[in-house]
Each structure stands twice: as C-alpha cells, then as structure tokens.
UniProtKB/Swiss-Prot annotation:
Its EC number is 7.1.1.-. This is NAD(P)H-quinone oxidoreductase subunit 5, chloroplastic. The lineage of its organism: Eukaryota, Viridiplantae, Streptophyta, Embryophyta, Tracheophyta. GO terms for cellular component: chloroplast thylakoid membrane. It is found in: Plastid, Chloroplast thylakoid membrane. It is a multi-pass membrane protein. The chain crosses the membrane at residues 9-29, 40-60, 88-108, 125-145, 147-167, 185-205, 225-245, 258-278, 283-303, 327-347, 354-374, 396-416, 425-445, 554-574, 610-630, 726-746. The gene is ndhF. Keywords: Chloroplast, Membrane, NAD, NADP, Plastid, Plastoquinone, Quinone, Thylakoid, Translocase, Transmembrane, Transmembrane helix, Transport. It catalyses: a plastoquinone + NADH + (n+1) H(+)(in) = a plastoquinol + NAD(+) + n H(+)(out); a plastoquinone + NADPH + (n+1) H(+)(in) = a plastoquinol + NADP(+) + n H(+)(out). Belongs to the complex I subunit 5 family. NDH is composed of at least 16 different subunits, 5 of which are encoded in the nucleus. Pfam families: Proton_antipo_C, Proton_antipo_M, Proton_antipo_N.
Length: 746
C-alpha cells in the first residue's frame, strides 16, 4: 500500500507524453506524425487507462482504510519564505481522479471516430491529453499555489478547446467570452490566496485549516477581512463552475466539438470549481456567512439554469443550461453542509451528462447528412423528430440518461438528487421548495429535449411548425408557445405526392424507385413504407432519413449507460442492518473533519423518494402533454379546442407562456445586460480614452514637437550667416521699438 501512495505522482504525468510527442512531431517530422495520426488516439486511451487503473487501486485502499498520504518537496528555502510542491492523496483526490480518467477514456474513444474527418485531429488529441493532465494536477495538488497553477492551465485548455474551430467567428467569440469571465474568477482566487497567506503565513491545506480555525475561535483575525478573502476564493469557483452571475460563458462553450462539451460538463472544467469548494470546506465552515453565501448562490443558479433551459432550440445549449442547474444543486449541497450528497451528485451527474452529450453528438452526426453541417441546423431540435426509428441505440441511451437526470429510480441521479432534496428541507423549507420545484422543471425540459428529438416524425422537410396544426403525415408538437401554420417545403420534400383523397382518407404515394403506388389509411404506416427511399431533386441526391452511428461511437455510450445504471447503488442511504453496503460513507469522507452518519431508515427514505419521484413524473407528464405526439393527435381532432375555449383565462395563459418563453429564449436577459451594460459601456469608455489619448495627450506632445520644429527652423534661417538677414532683423526690432514709443508716448 505504501508503494502505491509513493508512486501516485505518475497519475499527473502519464497523459503528458501524448501532448509533448504530438507537439514535437508536428514541429520536426510533420509528415510522419500525420501519417500515423490514428495511433495517437490509441496511445491516449492506453495512458489514461493506466491512470484509471491506478485510481481504482487508490480508491479501493481509500474505501478500506481512508489513508491520507502527502508528499512535499521544497523548491525555495529561506528564513522568511518556503515554496513547497507535492501531491495529496485522500478520498477526494481518489474519487476525482477516477472520475476524470473514466469519463476521459470514454470521450477519447468517442473522439477517434467523431473527429476523424477533421483536419485538426492531432491538435485535438494534444489539447485533450493536456486538459486531462491539468485536471489531474489540480485534484492532486497539496497547496493553494499548486491549485492556482493548474487552475490556470485548465482555463487555458478550455480556451483552446472551446475555440478549436477558431476560423468560425462565433467559436472565436465564445472562447474569448469564456476566457474573460474566468479571468474575473481567477483574479478573485489569486487575491483570496494572497489574503489567506497574509493571515496564516502558509499555503498548505492542513496548516491553513488549523491556523484559521484557531484564529477565528480566539478572535485573532479581522472577521471582515477573513470573510472578504473567503468570498474571493469562492469567486474563483463561481466562475469556473458557471454559477450565477458568471454562468453566461458555459452555454456559449457549446461552439467547441461535442466531445469537448462532454468532458467540460462532466469531469473537468466545471468540476474544478466544485472540487475547490469541497477541498476548502473546512475553511469555509469556520468563517461566518460563507456557507450561507454558497447555498444562496447554489439555489439561485439551480432555478435560473432550469428556467433558461425551457425554450432552447439547440440540443447542446439545452444540455448546457441543464449542467448549470445541476451544478447549482451540488453547490447548494455544499453550502448546506451536505458534503456526501454533493460529491455523490457530482459523480452521478458526470456519467449521466457525459452520456447525454455524447448521445447528442451521435444525433448531430446522424442529422448532418440530411440538413447540412451548419450547427444552426444539425443541432436544431425543431428540425429533428422521429429519430427513434433511425437511431434506436442512441435513442435508448439518451432516454436512460434523460430519465437519470430527471431523478427516476433506480438510475444514478435519483439517489444523489433525492439526498440533496432531503437535506435541503432540513436546512431551509424555502430552499427545499425551490429545489423540489426545480426538480419538476428538470424533468420537464429534459423530457422536452427527448420528445423533440425522438418523438413524432422527422420535421426536417417542413417549415413553420405549429402545435395546433396537423401535418399531412403525422402529428407534430414543437413549441408550447405556438408558431405559424405548417408549410411543406416542396423543394426539399423527399417524395412525390400524386393524389390525396380526403373523402375516404387515403393518401397515394409514388416513388421514383418503384413502379407501383402505395396506399395506406394510417399516416405512420405510410412513412414506415418509405423510410429507405432516396429521391433525385434539382440535380442533387437527398437522403431522406438519418442513420445510426458507427460502433466506435456507440460503445462509449453503452459503457456510460452501464455507469448510469449501477453507480447510484454505491450510495444506498438507508440502514442495511448487519451488512453495510454504503460505500460512499466509507469513501466520500472529508479528510480533515469527522464524517457523519448518513444512514436513514426505510420509511423515511421511501417517504422522501415517493414525493421527489412524483414531482419528476409530473414534470414528465406535462412535457408529454405539450410536446408528445399523442397530445398533437388530440389537437388534430379539435378535442382540446372543444374543452378549452377562447376566453380571458386562455388569453392570460398565453401571455404567461409568452413571458416564460421570452425569458428563457433571451437567456433571462442577463447576456443582454452584460452586452449593453458592461461590454458596450467599456467600448464607449475605451473610445473616449482613445480620443483623449490620440487628440489630447498626443496632440499636446505633437504640438510641442511641431512648435519646436518651426522655432528651430526660424532660428536656423535667421542665423544662417547672411548680412541681409541680420540687417532685416535689426530694422524690425528698431521699427517695433519706434512704434511702441510713438503709440504709448513714453
């Protein structure tokens, strides 16, 4: 066991050779490096698998003994200052390293196929390996200065990966936005580190916690200054984990490749802020008001993220706001003191969200041959629908990930979210009500994403859909807020309609690849008969329907499904009696504080679970009403209009729906406020400063220079040695003297 801890530093350096090898290879032997480019994916997966094996070994030892190991090496030694670097192995380190390595392996395997067509394939894997290295260095850091170094490296990698397709202006703008917002948090983090070093004289975690605890209890430090430093530290976590009000960068980070989105949202970028708060929890507990601030930011973020996800049309952006909301749950749990539930939900959410993002990438790839390679089309859920027929494996995995995030048992997120909801009720009934309400919203918008993507039939060849109009072929329900009547895009329609007999309700179809005519009374059956046809229109082939992804893409999805099914079982919270299966109570313990007993009895667990699941099921039901194909069928039969007549209540309901839609679609007007209130103000100020600098400061300097030039030229001309010039100057002086003498009458 000692040898395992002594050589734990290799966790940090194992993924690094891939980045260095690709970099030197592209620099010195670019042709050979590009010829064997697919080999680098295998090497990346192999090295990260070694990290996973090492992390599993550490996790087993932590579960059995919770042994803490710290190694320090001094870099600078003098009487006043000592800078030490090392690594810390504790339960938090082991769980984070295992999470990073497992999700990272799945993302790398997925990326080999997903990015195979991209010219930046090698650059992508170099960035990914360095991203994993930076995150592993962050979670193994033994002091605050190391955390800050790797914190900056994580931010740099996210900047490079979000702007991976930097030739696209929107991607370049997104990575700049993420970089600038994280600069705000990083500046606060650095000031907080310097403040606590000034208070304690140490940057090591154990010394820092002990000294601050003693100073607080003995009134040996200014409370206001300590609170300020703690708030600055928390500001870094707010920016990195996309908490309100610095959350606006995360939805725009979707401009990067989809595997990057999965890694950022699951195990790296956003997990860094959660890790920092979890690591510094013993420090935050003893400082007044900080835990209240953390819980307040968490409750605001979880509600805000859920409301902003309600009306998004981009599948990746909807998942991004879902991440914001779920991170709010984790931050709330940390703020109310539920350390175990917070880390538990971090684990379950990571696997579920990685599954959803990789599934969305499979969906996007299947839609690209149909709608084109523009993200505005391939990621637009309005153009999807009915994909369950064409991508059945992706649909099944996406459904399981959706139900997990909705909190449906026995999937992973049910266990962790239910524990957070229960603990929040003990902390504050108001917070609990908001958390339960947001759980219902989560089920609503996540099932909305699923229904818009997989339910109904493919809408790519139709325009201006309406939830109140009937399609010629199937029932559609796209937006709860309503749109214009349905129009058929005749130019892109992949089949030809010869005749429609309304009286006997028959539709006749003709295929260019068939001599016969197909008849059917049921629209869905007609579509099933045509799903493999291809037609030739306007000198181009049009593939009618998407297709399932390749096995190298589906395999990571199936593995993540397995994690989603079983990872929640390690945290069974109720009392098991003689045999204790609660691995989390042994594993997810705070290394610097005594762990609490988290077991509950069966009755309490079932009571809380029934209520939380009922809320989630209600959200699923509402989503199926507004977006399901069954509801649209009722609308087509005018049953809804028969029971719900136009009146004051209906008008009020429409107004409420429009307000919610505008709030969600415009991102809560927060981006608009930042753009007009901050960005435009800064630009106007910069233009004013530029004018002042160019025309005032430079004008004075240049004016003095020009005046000096003309004076010098005049003196040089007069003093050139010509007698005529001297005589002219003399006569001028005499004339001026005589004029003054005559005028003033001296």
């Amino acid at each position: 066991m000692e040898h395992t801890y002594q050589y734990a530093y290799i966790i940090l350096f194992l993924p690094l050779p891939v980045t260095m090898s690709i970099g030197f290879g592209l620099l010195f032997v670019p042709t050979a490096t590009k010829n064997i480019r697919r080999m680098w994916a295998f090497v990346s997966v192999l090295l990260l698998s070694m990290v996973m094996g090492f992390s599993v070994n550490l996790a087993i030892q932590q579960i059995n003994g919770s042994f803490i190991y710290q190694y320090l090496c001094s870099w600078t030694i003098n009487n006043d200052f000592s800078l030490e670097f090392g690594y810390l192995i504790d339960p938090l380190t082991s769980i984070m390293s295992l999470l990073i390595s497992t999700v990272g392996i799945m993302v790398l395997m997925y990326s080999d196929n997903y990015m195979s067509h991209d010219q930046g394939y090698l650059r992508f894997f170099a960035y990914m390996s360095f991203f994993n290295t930076s995150m592993l260095g962050l979670v193994t850091s033994s002091n605050l200065i190391q955390i800050h170094i790797f914190w900056e490296l994580v931010g740099m990698c996210s900047y490079l990966l979000i702007g991976f397709w930097f030739t696209r202006p929107i991607a370049a703008s997104a990575c700049q936005k993420a970089f600038v917002i994280n600069r705000v948090g990083d500046f606060g983090l650095l000031l907080g580190i310097l403040g606590f070093y000034w208070i304690t004289g140490s940057l090591e975690f154990r010394d820092l916690f002990e000294i601050v605890n003693n100073l607080i209890h003995n009134n040996g430090v200014n409370f206001r200054f300590a609170i300020l430093c703690a708030c600055l530290l928390f500001l870094g976590a707010v920016a990195k984990s996309a908490q309100f009000p610095l959350h606006v960068w995360l939805p725009d980070a979707m401009e990067g490749p989809t595997p990057i989105s999965a890694l950022i949202h699951a195990a790296t970028m956003v997990a860094a802020g959660i890790f920092l708060v979890a690591r510094l929890r013993p420090l935050f507990i003893v400082i007044p008001y900080i835990m209240n601030l953390i819980s307040l930011i968490g409750i605001i973020t979880l509600l805000l993220g859920a409301t902003l996800a309600l009306a998004q049309g981009d599948i990746k952006r909807s998942l991004a706001y879902s991440t914001v909301s779920q991170l709010g749950y984790i931050m709330l749990a940390l703020g109310i003191g539920s350390y175990r539930a917070a880390l538990f939900h971090l684990i379950t959410h990571a696997y579920s969200k990685a599954l959803l993002f990789l599934g969305s990438g499979s969906i996007i790839h299947s839609m690209e041959p149909v709608v084109g390679y523009s993200p505005d089309k391939s990621q637009n859920m309005v153009l999807m629908g009915g994909l369950k027929k064409y991508v059945p494996v992706t649909r099944t995995t996406f459904l399981l990930g959706t139900l997990s995030l909705c909190g449906i048992p026995p999937l992973a997120c049910f266990w962790s979210k239910d524990e957070i909801l229960t603990d929040s009720w003990l902390y504050s009934p108001i917070f609990a009500i908001i958390a339960y309400f947001t759980a219902g919203l989560t089920a609503f918008y996540m099932f909305r994403v699923y229904l818009l993507t997989f339910d109904g039939c493919l809408r790519v060849h139709f325009q201006n859909y309406s939830s109140t109009k009937r399609s010629l072929f199937c029932s559609m329900s796209v937006s709860v807020w309503g749109r214009e009547p349905l129009k058929i895009d005749n130019q892109n329609l992949p089949f030809l309609i010869l005749k429609r007999n309304i009286n006997n309700n028959k539709v006749f179809f003709f295929s260019f690849f068939s001599k016969g005519t197909y008849k059917n009374k049921i629209y869905n059956n007609v579509i099933n008969r045509m799903q493999y046809f291809r037609t030739y229109f306007q000198n181009k082939y049009t593939y009618m329907y998407p297709h399932e992804s390749e096995n190298t893409v589906l395999f990571p999805l199936l593995v993540l499904v397995l994690f989603t099914l079983v990872v929640g079982l390690i945290g069974i919270p109720f009392d098991q009696g003689v045999i204790d299966f609660d691995i989390l109570s042994k594993w997810l313990t705070n290394p610097f504080q005594k762990n609490l007993n988290h077991s509950v009895d069966w009755y309490e667990f079932l009571t809380n679970a029934i209520f939380s699941v009922s809320v989630s099921l209600f959200g699923l039901f509402i989503a199926s009403i507004f977006y399901g194909s069954v509801y649209s069928s009722f609308q087509n039969l005018d049953l809804i209009n028969f029971f719900v007549k136009r009146g004051p209540r209906r008008i009020l309901l429409d107004q409420i729906k429009n307000v919610i839609y505008n709030w969600s679609y415009n991102r809560g007007y927060i981006d608009i406020f930042y753009t007009k209130g901050l960005t435009m103000s800064i630009r106007r100020l910069s233009k004013l400063i530029q004018f002042f600098d160019r025309y005032i400061i430079d004008g004075i300097t240049n004016g003095i220079g020009v005046a000096s030039f003309f004076i010098g030229e005049g003196i040089r001309y007069i003093g050139g040695g010509r007698i005529s010039s001297y005589l002219f100057l003399y006569l001028s002086y005499v004339s001026i003297f005589l004029i003054f003498y005559q005028y003033f009458d001296f």
